[in-house]
Regions:
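Negatively charged, low-complexity tracts enriched in Asp/Glu with abundant Ser/Thr
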Residues: 1-17
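A general marker of short, structured functional hotspots
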Residues: 7, 12, 45, 52, ...
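Generic detector of leucine side chains in alpha-helical contexts
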Residues: 14, 26-27, 40-41, 60, ...
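Short acidic/glycine-enriched loop/turn segments that link adjacent beta-strands
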Residues: 20-21
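Short aromatic-glycine-(Arg/Gly/Cys) micro-motifs in beta-strand/loop hairpins
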Residues: 24-54, 69-70
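A short, charged, amphipathic alpha-helix used as a generic interaction element across diverse proteins
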Residues: 58-74
Length: 75
C-alpha cells in the first residue's frame, strides 16, 4: 500500500474507503499500537497527514474488524 511519513514514523495504508461521512483508512506503523483506524485522513501542505479520529490496535484482526464495522456504520 501507499506509505507516508509523519515525523519519524512510516505509515502504510492497508485499506481505504470513502463513506458518505468522509474517508476511513486502516494504517500500519512500526511502533507501539501498530494498527490505526483513522477517519478523515487529510494530506497537509508539508506532505504529512492528519486525521480527525483514530482508534489504535495491537492486533491486525481487531483493527480490520473495527475498520469494517465503522464502514458499515458510516454508509
Amino acid at each position: 500500500g501507499y506509505i507516508f511519513r509523519n515525523g519519524t514514523i512510516d505509515y502504510t495504508v492497508l485499506d481505504y474507503a470513502e463513506t458518505r461521512f468522509g474517508n476511513i483508512a486502516l494504517l500500519r506503523r512500526d511502533t507501539y499500537c501498530p494498527f490505526v483506524v483513522a477517519r478523515l485522513l487529510q494530506k497537509q501542505p508539508d506532505g504529512t497527514y492528519i486525521w480527525a479520529w483514530g482508534s489504535y490496535f495491537n492486533e491486525l484482526p481487531n483493527a480490520e474488524s473495527f475498520f469494517h464495522t465503522r464502514i458499515n456504520e458510516l454508509q
